[in-house]
Each structure stands twice: as C-alpha cells, then as structure tokens.
C-alpha cells in the first residue's frame, strides 16, 4: 500500500469580487456551510472563505479569495473549466434544477454524460458549476480492470448538434421546491474539469507522475472535436476525479485567472510524511515544488502541471475545528497566530460579513 497516495480532491479555490454576495449565494442558494472566515495568508488584506459540508471534510471544500479589483477571468488552456458537485440521483438533480430556476438562476441540462447526468449554472461571478449524479459509473461500457485503456465514443444522440435540446430544457421537477432538503444536500464534489493543450501529455502527468488511475477516454460531448479524459484516485469514486478537455496546441487561447475563475485546486493526502514523499517524487520527475507551507487547517505544497495549472497537495488535517467550536464554524473571522498582532488592521481592511 502506498501511504503517500493521493486519495482524492481536497479543495478548489476560486476568485470572487464580493465576499458577502458569495456567502449569500453559496449558503443560501447552494446550501453549503461557511466553515471558515479567514484571510489569504499570502495576501492578508483579502478574505479567504471556505465552504463545505457540515463536517468541513476534504473533498467538500470550495474556497474563495475576495479580490474586488481582479479582472474578469475566462476559461482557456491552463485554467479550470468547471467544478462539479455530487447529487445522489436524477430525481434529486431535477429538484436542484427546479430550486435554482425558481431562484432566478439559469440552468442548462440535464445532459446524459453516459457515466453520470449533469446540469450546469454559474455563480454571481461566472464560475461554472455542475451538479452531477453519482452514477451509473465508469463500468457501464468497460470492465473494471480495463478502465481508461481505449477510446469510448458516446452515443451520437448525447452529443451537441444531435441531442434534443428542447426536450432536455423541459426536464425539471414537477412541483416547486421550497427549500434545499436533506436529500439534496451537496456533501462532496464529484469532479474538477480543466482545459489542456495536449491530452496525452496531461494523462502521462496525472497517471504516471501523480499516480492517479486512468478511468475513461471519451470525447467532449459538447465539442466532439476534442477528447475528454478522466483520472481518479482509488476506484475513481466521485470526489476523487479530475478530467480535462484536450485541444490542439495553439487552437485555444490561454485562460485568465480572475473573478469567476479557479485559482488552483488541491489533492488530498494523509499527512506531512506523504507530502515529503511527494516533494521527492516531484523533484525526481523534474517538477519544482514549494516547501511545506502551514495553512493552519492543513499543510500544503504547490507545483504546476504541464499547462501551468497551479496544483496543491494538502493534508487531510488538522482540520477546521482547530481554532473554532465545530458547531460554530465560519461564524467569526479567524487568523493564524502569526497574524493575530495585526488583527485590528486586517479587520479594518475587510468588509464585515453577515452570515446566516
């Protein structure tokens, strides 16, 4: 057993322009819990907000830097395209669609992705969010021991230009959804998808350098000229999956990190011993990585993939209850010990938040 192995997604960090608007959207419209109010440790004048499930578990965490003056980000090579959260079934997904549209949020789908079913929408800054069903899973068209070895084109009727868009748009829950109930609660991410300039080079990096398991080789259902490749940790369960659309070099512009765009995403490991092992493995592969950095709630190292995506390997602990009662996470501004002496000045630069 590889004790340093990546076990799944830890978190994804994006950029927002307005912390209060972001809190209102993710807690009020998506039912996530604000599990930590702190600051960007590398830029203490900016909020760093963490949203997740009630336990603030790795794999549930979506975080934001508040940069009000940031340019509008856009997707492209070197940036994330979207982040997906998991819902149990098509029925709970239909309820999500009815809830979101009932709250004035434009939703596309549900789309049949063969391995799961998807709806899409955007947050107030334009971050693309997907809610994907748990199944049916990767083995609907491949044996478990042969995943990701051969190209699996999707049924043509599921692809852009061939599917019945009007019928898809009409699918929703038949009754109004007055609130996000327990069955709808988003407990973890499903996957993260980014854009790559060379799909096979990217597969080599994630599968060989990072040791993730190839899960699927298919095509982008919305742009059948581009491949869509998937890797995961362990058995490839939701919450462990990273995917990318591949494009020919020069055929797509580079993305721009800004508001409405991902800054980086983090993969989960057990502890600092695993991080030290990853520093050695990355160095042996010629991939520069940072020293281990103390992020208070976890430890981190940072590096980049071949297209320049900022990646992080983060530890599962010590967790978000280290400085706050677990029943009151996210209710007040928390600073690490090395910033406490500057609390008054830091708080004075931050716009107060209304939570709950």
Model-found features: residue ranges?
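Residues that form or immediately flank small-molecule/cofactor binding pockets and catalytic motifs
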Residues: 39, 69, 136, 219, ...
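Surface-exposed interaction/gating patches
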Residues: 8-9, 175-221, 226-228, 235, ...
């Amino acid at each position: 057993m590889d004790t340093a192995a990546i076990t799944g997604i830890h978190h994804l960090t994006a950029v927002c322009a307005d912390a209060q608007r972001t809190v209102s959207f993710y807690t009020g419209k998506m039912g996530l819990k604000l599990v930590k109010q702190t600051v960007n440790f590398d830029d203490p004048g900016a909020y760093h907000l963490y949203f997740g499930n009630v336990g603030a578990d790795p794999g549930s965490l979506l975080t934001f830097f508040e940069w009000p003056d940031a340019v509008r980000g856009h997707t492209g090579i070197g940036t994330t395209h979207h982040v997906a959260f998991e819902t149990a079934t098509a029925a709970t997904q239909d309820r999500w669609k009815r809830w979101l549209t009932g709250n004035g949020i434009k939703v596309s789908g549900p789309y049949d992705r063969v391995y799961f079913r998807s709806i899409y929408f955007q947050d107030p800054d334009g971050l693309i969010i997907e809610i994907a069903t748990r199944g049916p899973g990767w083995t609907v068209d491949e044996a478990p021991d042969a995943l990701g070895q051969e190209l699996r084109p999707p049924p043509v009727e599921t692809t852009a230009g061939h599917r019945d868009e009007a019928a898809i748009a009409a699918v929703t829950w038949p009754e109004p959804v007055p609130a996000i109930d327990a069955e709808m609660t988003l407990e973890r991410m499903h996957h993260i998808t980014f854009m790559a300039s060379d799909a096979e080079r990217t597969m080599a990096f994630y599968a060989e350098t990072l040791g993730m398991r190839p899960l699927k080789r298919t095509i982008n259902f919305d742009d059948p000229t581009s491949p869509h490749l998937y890797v995961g940790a362990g058995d490839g369960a939701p919450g462990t999956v990273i995917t990318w659309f591949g494009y020919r070099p020069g055929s797509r512009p580079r993305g721009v990190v800004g508001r409405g765009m991902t800054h980086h995403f983090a993969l989960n490991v057990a502890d600092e011993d695993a991080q030290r092992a990853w520093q050695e493995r990355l160095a042996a592969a010629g991939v520069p990585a940072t020293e281990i950095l103390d992020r208070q709630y976890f430890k981190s190292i940072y590096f980049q993939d071949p297209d320049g995506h900022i990646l992080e390997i983060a530890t599962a602990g010590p967790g978000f209850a280290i400085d706050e009662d677990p029943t009151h996470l996210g209710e007040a501004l928390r600073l690490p010990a090395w910033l406490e002496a500057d609390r008054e000045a830091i708080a004075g630069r931050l716009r107060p938040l209304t939570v709950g």
